[in-house]
Amino acid sequence: MLGIILSYVCYHFIYGTRITSREGEAYHKLEGKGVYSPLAVFPSADMDTVSQDFYYQTRDEIFAATCQIYLENQYTREQYEAETERLRNLKFSYQDQTNMLYQDEENYCSVAYVAMANWTDRYEYAITLDDSNTIIYVYLQNMDAKDIHMQSDYLPKYFQDNNAGKHQDTDP
């Protein structure tokens, strides 16, 4: 019995506790616990949308916490244009340096506004889907491709599994 209790405690000490949320309203309550980013690309929590899909999972592991946030917002045309304008003009400061998101049309399935691209195994970006007035906001931290909740099409072409050191391209 002591062995079972000890193995349970060791497992949770090493692999941490997983927190998962799938409810649309959970995005509005997101406080960024276990997230090592200001989540600059994500919209304000009070923004109205036509529809919303949200997934949040974090696991506080002993060596490297993992986190994935996926938010898909469909907007009216006017809301979509205002939100893409916000992304185009977004500036944020870090250590006396001001940066803007960069626009990437080559490495994503559509035009993306990127804040972080494989910076210490972290990715933060927003993909714009013009034909449906939809924006997909993504934050990934120390994630393996097989554990990611969203479609693999929404990953950048240069995505690397956590510490795997291999690109996920399928080209020979």
Predicted regions and their residues:
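N-terminal export/targeting and maturation segments
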Residues: S7-E81
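Extracytoplasmic electrostatic interaction patches
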Residues: E83-P172
